[in-house]
């Protein structure tokens, strides 16, 4: 080995100065210079090994010297050496090391190349001027260089060039005889290189240690402090020095300069493999995830802040020290640690606008474990400040359009006031466009989402990867798509394993929803069935009709007369107008109401729609329109239109709660054998949600939305169809007890308090098979206004009311709403997910794109707790979903 290279290895790991004979070896066999050890004792009143943190009981002077180091230094001092090929003058000298100073006494020209590590070439002061080698960083020209462009430095062979700065690895900026310019590196030989900047880093956030006794190894600092980097401890921690203190600090809290980056990369521990389900850091994820897809990583090195007991510290070596071994609970806080730069490296992920949601603008599609069948649970919605409107031209349709389907959309305003708006074909016809084509039940479902937003997809076919960067697809597995390539391949990550890669786009189907105006807007729809039998499409219209005068506190309800456009495979005709009452609470202004209607009309082409298989029903009859009322205010009764046919039916829905003035809306009655009943449900938060079964009826086939049969014996086929439809539409019969939602959780299900008044009346239309039983509900009031008795009377004339049923006072849970996409064969029925509200007690910067950025005081909805102490949840502030350490939050 060359002598200069050997000297470079003999340096103190702390100060990086050349070791001399006074260096001391610790009991752990690590060697440091005496000056550094004395500095550690003086600053911390104890001596711990900077490498492995082993406590040293004896004093610095009592420590033994490193015998091997002393022998190496003696051998180098006594050994004469020959000048290298680049030496000048052919002089031979010995490189003598002084015992204390480690300085060079005599040196040849080759020594000048290796003098960057702390030695001072004293021979320069005595050199004759004819050599022309300055003491500044310099290089010797090996060839003539004339320069090819203005600004280049011209020199001749043998010239000594003073180095000013290094532009890149191939070019320098230097000076010859007072002339400055650029020259290529391969034309010169570096005699004395430019001084390397010290490895330093700048603090991006405050790093504080609350328990100084338990975390005395940590190096606290404030924002904008400049630290000297000593070495990298492990994947997430580095060792540094601030003033006279030495300790470890998290890498994500600082920004390194070029020298420190090289040091950090050089000291990077080897990673045998990466388990991407454990969410490694962004650097390891981009390189190792594709190379080692099947290998496992030590789960204890998963993250810096995973709490472990301090008992593990003593057994860890210098290379096996795990970054998470600080102390339970985690006691690290920061001023405002955000890792937006790391997350934004993935194309399509934006961290600037808080309204942009990680998975879906209006909420999270809850995914089950991989072993369970894929279901679409209730979506958790969080308020958004910025309305998101899907752009029609920003998506790539994967398949050609199949039959036309439609759905009724209910939009809500950003202020929280509710407005039931029927939307679809009429607005599209007014704009000169036809209804939006949608995929069938077994095909991919077209969705409207810009490419810059990540979307959730479900694998509909298995796929085995053929290259390193490809992902394995398992049927039913959820994926978050970041980018859709032009060749039909998608780039995304698995929501089960967190692996990132590419996969064919025709092997997956979209799951997320396109939204209407704000994140509170909800679209209810039913599972795709036989689309060819016809689907009713309802949209707002400006045609004249009875208007409801403002009443009470100025609540104005202007019912829009809605024409019903029916798309059929054969003989279904467009029915006459239907009346839909629109109620707005006093919190809703006129401008907000107009904006809600405009949004629905403008985006009527962007609604996810689906069809429901019609069910054959005998002796179906028509119900009149239900009256709509507001508690504590007078009710407006609407005249009953004439019965249109034996196959048309309607529904009256009423939901009331004590001491809560809420708008009760009712379904429309359509004077045609073909109609659709809409159930409008009002949540306690003031938002209104439409449930549209979308059941086309005819004299031969009439739809039954939900309910239980009380008379007649249907055949097996009809019974099976009804049973399947009930599961798809409601997930439970009307006799099911109400499910209590978590308190204050903004879910899509109607939350029923235990001490509140039960629901009165039916929650939906009931049309039993083989009979003519029906139920009519009314909006109960407190006696302030008349009740629309005409509707009930006429309804009782047509049907006899069921006795001993649940009509009177037993609370009935509304049917769980479906997600806004039809998964076809992979979706069974909605499954509720219990989530807990947690508050962030300590801010947490994410270490990878799969983790959440937590700020102190944030509210997180936790819906999965893992065995390793990590939680999976959704951040209420921006709706993003990801992983975070459980010790950073507390249950509330």
Curated annotation (Swiss-Prot):
Region (Interaction with AKT2): 447-550
Ranges of Polar residues composition bias in the record: 305-321, 538-551
Pathway in which this enzyme or protein is active: Protein modification; protein ubiquitination
EC number: 2.3.2.27
Pfam family, one: SH3_9
Biased composition regions of type Basic and acidic residues, renumbered to the chain: 713-724
Catalyzed reactions: S-ubiquitinyl-[E2 ubiquitin-conjugating enzyme]-L-cysteine + [acceptor protein]-L-lysine = [E2 ubiquitin-conjugating enzyme]-L-cysteine + N(6)-ubiquitinyl-[acceptor protein]-L-lysine
The keyword Cytoplasm is assigned to this record: yes
GO annotations of cellular component type: Golgi apparatus; lamellipodium; perinuclear region of cytoplasm
Residues annotated as domain SH3: 134-193, 196-259, 452-513, 833-892
Tissues and organs where the protein is expressed, per its UniProt entry: Ubiquitously expressed.
Database matches in PROSITE patterns: SH3, ZF_RING_1, ZF_RING_2
Keyword Phosphoprotein in annotation: yes
InterPro entries for this protein: Endophilin_SH3RF, SH3-like_dom_sf, SH3_domain, SH3RF1/SH3RF3_SH3_4, SH3RF1_SH3_2, Znf_RING, Znf_RING/FYVE/PHD, Znf_RING_CS
Keywords in alphabetical order: Cell projection, Cytoplasm, Golgi apparatus, Metal-binding, Phosphoprotein, Repeat, SH3 domain, Transferase, Ubl conjugation, Ubl conjugation pathway, Zinc, Zinc-finger
GO molecular function, one term: MAP-kinase scaffold activity
Domain remark in the UniProt entry: The RING finger domain is required for ubiquitin ligase activity and autoubiquitination.
Family (UniProt): Belongs to the SH3RF family.
Protein name: E3 ubiquitin-protein ligase SH3RF1
């Amino acid at each position: 080995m060359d002598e200069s290279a050997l000297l470079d290895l003999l340096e103190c790991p702390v100060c990086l100065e050349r070791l001399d004979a006074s260096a001391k070896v610790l009991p752990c066999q690590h060697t440091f210079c005496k000056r550094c050890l004395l500095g550690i004792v003086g600053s911390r009143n104890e001596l711990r090994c900077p490498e492995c943190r082993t406590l040293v009981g004896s004093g610095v002077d009592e420590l033994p010297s490193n015998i091997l180091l002393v022998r190496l230094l003696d051998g180098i001092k006594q050994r004469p050496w020959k000048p290298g090929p680049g030496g000048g003058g052919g002089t031979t000298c010995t490189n003598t090391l002084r015992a204390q100073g480690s300085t060079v006494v005599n040196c040849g020209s080759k020594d000048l190349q290796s003098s960057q590590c702390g030695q001072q070439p004293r021979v320069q002061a005595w050199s004759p001027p004819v050599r022309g080698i300055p003491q500044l960083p310099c290089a010797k020209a090996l060839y003539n260089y004339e320069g090819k462009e203005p600004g280049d430095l011209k020199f001749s062979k043998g010239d000594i060039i003073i180095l000013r700065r290094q532009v890149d690895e191939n070019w320098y900026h230097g000076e010859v005889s007072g002339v400055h310019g650029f020259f290529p590196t391969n034309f010169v030989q570096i005699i004395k290189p430019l001084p390397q900047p010290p490895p330093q880093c700048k603090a991006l956030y405050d790093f504080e240690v609350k328990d100084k006794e338990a975390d005395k190894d940590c190096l606290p600092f404030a924002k904008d402090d400049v630290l000297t980097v000593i070495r990298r401890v492990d994947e997430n921690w580095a060792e540094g020095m601030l003033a006279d203190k030495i300790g470890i600090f998290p890498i994500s809290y600082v920004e390194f300069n070029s020298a420190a980056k090289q040091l950090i990369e050089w000291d990077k521990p080897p990673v045998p493999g990466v388990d991407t389900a454990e969410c490694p850091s962004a650097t390891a994820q981009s390189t190792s995830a594709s190379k080692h897809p099947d290998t496992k990583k030590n789960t204890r090195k998963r993250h810096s802040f995973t709490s472990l007991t301090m008992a593990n510290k003593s057994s860890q070596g210098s290379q096996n020290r795990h970054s998470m071994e600080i102390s339970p609970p985690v006691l690290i806080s920061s001023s405002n640690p955000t890792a937006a730069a790391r997350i934004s490296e993935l194309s399509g992920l934006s961290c600037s606008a808080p309204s942009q949601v990680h998975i879906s603008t209006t909420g999270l599609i809850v995914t089950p474990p991989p072993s369970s069948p894929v279901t679409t649970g209730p979506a958790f919605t969080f308020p958004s400040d910025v309305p998101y409107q899907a752009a029609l031209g920003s998506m790539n349709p994967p398949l050609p359009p199949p039959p036309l389907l439609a759905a009724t959309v209910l939009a809500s305003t950003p202020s929280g006031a509710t407005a039931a708006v029927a939307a679809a074909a009429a607005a599209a016809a007014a704009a000169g466009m036809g209804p939006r084509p949608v995929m069938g039940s077994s095909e991919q479902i077209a969705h409207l989402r810009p490419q810059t937003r990540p979307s959730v997809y479900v694998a509909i076919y298995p796929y085995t990867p053929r290259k390193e960067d490809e992902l394995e697809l398992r049927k039913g597995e959820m994926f978050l798509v970041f980018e859709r390539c032009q060749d039909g391949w998608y780039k995304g990550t698995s929501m089960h394993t967190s692996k990132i890669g590419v996969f064919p786009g025709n092997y997956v189907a979209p799951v997320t929803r396109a939204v209407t105006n704000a994140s509170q807007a909800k679209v209810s729809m039913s599972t795709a069935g036989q689309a060819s039998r016809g689907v009713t499409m309802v949209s707002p219209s400006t045609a004249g009709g009875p208007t409801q005068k403002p009443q009470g506190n100025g609540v104005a309800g202007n019912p829009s007369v809605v024409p019903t456009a029916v798309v059929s495979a054969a003989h279904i005709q467009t029915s006459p107008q239907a009346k839909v009452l629109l109620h707005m609470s006093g919190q809703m202004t006129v401008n907000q109401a107009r904006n809600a209607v405009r949004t629905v009309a403008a985006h009527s082409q962007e609604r996810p729609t689906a069809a429901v298989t019609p069910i054959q029903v005998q002796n179906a009859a028509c119900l009149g329109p239900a009256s709509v009322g507001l508690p504590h205010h007078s009710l407006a009764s609407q005249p009953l239109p004439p019965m249109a046919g034996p196959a048309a039916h309607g529904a009256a829905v009423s939901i009331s709660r004590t001491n809560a003035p809420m708008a009760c809306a009712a379904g429309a009655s359509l004077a045609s054998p073909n109609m659709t009943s809409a159930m409008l449900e009002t949540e306690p938060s003031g938002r209104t949600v439409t449930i549209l079964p979308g059941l086309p009826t005819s004299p031969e086939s009439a739809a039954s939305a939900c309910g239980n049969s009380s008379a007649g014996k249907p055949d097996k086929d009809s019974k099976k169809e009804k049973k399947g439809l009930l599961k798809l539409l409601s997930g439970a019969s009307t006799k099911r007890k109400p499910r209590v939602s978590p308190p204050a959780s903004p879910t899509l299900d109607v939350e029923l308090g235990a001490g509140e008044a039960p629901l009165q009346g039916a929650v939906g239309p009931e049309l039993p098979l083989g009979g003519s039983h029906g139920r009519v509900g009314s909006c109960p009031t407190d006696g302030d206004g008349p009740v629309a008795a005409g509707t009930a009377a006429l309804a009782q004339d047509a049907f006899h009311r069921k006795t001993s049923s649940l009509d009177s006072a037993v609370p009935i849970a509304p049917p769980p709403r479906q997600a806004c996409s039809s998964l076809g064969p992979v979706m069974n029925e909605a499954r509720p997910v219990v989530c807990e509200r947690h508050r962030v007690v300590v801010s947490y910067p994410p270490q990878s794109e799969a983790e959440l950025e937590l700020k102190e005081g944030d509210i997180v909805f936790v819906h999965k707790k893992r065995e390793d102490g990590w939680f999976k949840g959704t951040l209420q502030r921006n709706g993003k979903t990801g992983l975070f350490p459980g010790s950073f939050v507390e249950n509330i």
